[in-house]
């Protein structure tokens, strides 16, 4: 029987309007101090793990009570996740740390259907959440009372400099006709959902960034893990699961010449990735984080539409902000370019500061615009990059089975999520009696759709894809039995 353990902490809010405070994220002018109250559900007599699979916090924002539901991001690390640094004599030192009991969560705000959250619970709560259309940041306060946290909007953080920060990508597709055609296709809401894709990510940290954080590997690791957790959350609406495969820190020297010209650095990094990094471990996309100030106020650069290419599936990003969230947005932006997304056209896209905006904004969004979604859908249709089709093997994702993490793990028949799921039993992650399926383009009300039912409309020369009548999956290229 599940009992609710209530950790009672005095719930208080002290808005310091007009005051200024220096946080890890920078100098903040307008913020609230909150004392979250934690509610967690554990089986009677169970030993509480350091980081629970699911947690709930209650606090107030602008005088209104909010309930933050969090679930551990179980798919964040591959089973063979590795970390590499280098000794003074140049030896490569690679370790395979245990990351099963990590502290990175995603979630939502209760009774806010449009809400999202990406939170690190390593030392208090740090990250962001979206509430009633606004993005808020939360982080612990360094006070004698360790439970105190600051909640604030990103635009209330003082700018670190006045120069506009922008992506250096200027190339465009030769024509946008395919984009227009893709957006005009008639698809049912179910068919419009993006197919599940999986990206195994490699992060490389250059020597300049390593020394920027006092040559402290633990600080680098924590910062990168928070970034990847944020990227994972931002990619979820596109049905993309991000898994961190490796972290390579150039602790003694750079292995390429990191230059002020971002495209040149990306080219050199792509060469090194093809020659060296891919031979260490298989992955789909790599990004170089650097402390270098790129020319022309550029903070990132990536090749357009080159996902899965051994040389060109790369991006370079300046560690341009003390705020993890902002650097993570830039990393997601460059990943978006690799997935075929161009910059948002301010006259055509109904999003002032979405992820693919060419210039970073004071009111930066964590969302992809409709334009970006159209570009991505067209890229999948026209290019169908093969490396991101494969789900991690059930033994490749570090986790014990837990519902709602978007990975089908060992022992699971379905990823159940909510206890109200009519097809999947949330307690066992098994299909309910009489159910054939729980999700998929060929699943309808827990049953396989009839044979030959169209599950994906024809694109170009490709025929309609049709259900087999024996699976919830929609096979490619009209292959049905």
Curated annotation (Swiss-Prot):
> What GO terms describe the biological role, i.e. biological process, of this protein?
proteolysis
Q: Which residues form the propeptide?
A: 21-190, 393-408
Q: Where in the cell is it found?
A: Secreted
Cysteines engaged in disulfide bonds, as pairs: 308-387, 349-371, 351-354, 414-429, 416-424, 423-446, 437-443, 442-467, 455-474
Q: Where does Zn(2+) bind?
A: 333, 337, 343
All copies of domain Disintegrin, residue ranges: 400-481
Where's it mainly located? secreted
Tissue expression summary: Expressed by the venom gland.
EC number(s): the record gives 3.4.24.-
Q: Which residues form the signal peptide?
A: 1-20
Annotated Gene Ontology MF terms? metal ion binding; metalloendopeptidase activity; toxin activity
- Which free-text remark accompanies the cofactor? Binds 1 zinc ion per subunit.
Enumerate the spans annotated as Peptidase M12B domain. Answer: 197-392
Which segment of this protein is annotated as the motif Cell attachment site? 459-461
Its GO CC terms are:
extracellular region; plasma membrane
Q: Which UniProt keywords apply?
A: Cell adhesion impairing toxin, Disulfide bond, Hemostasis impairing toxin, Hydrolase, Metal-binding, Metalloprotease, Platelet aggregation inhibiting toxin, Protease, Secreted, Signal, Toxin, Zinc, Zymogen
* InterPro entries in the cross-refs: Disintegrin_CS, Disintegrin_dom, Disintegrin_dom_sf, MetalloPept_cat_dom_sf, Peptidase_M12B, Peptidase_M12B_N, Reprolysin_adamalysin
Q: So which cofactors does this thing need?
A: Zn(2+)
Record note on quaternary structure = Monomer.
The record's similarity note reads: Belongs to the venom metalloproteinase (M12B) family. P-II subfamily. P-IIa sub-subfamily.
Misc remark: The sequence shown is that of elegantin-1a.
Please report the name of this protein according to its UniProt entry: Zinc metalloproteinase/disintegrin
- Give the source species: Protobothrops elegans (Elegant pitviper)
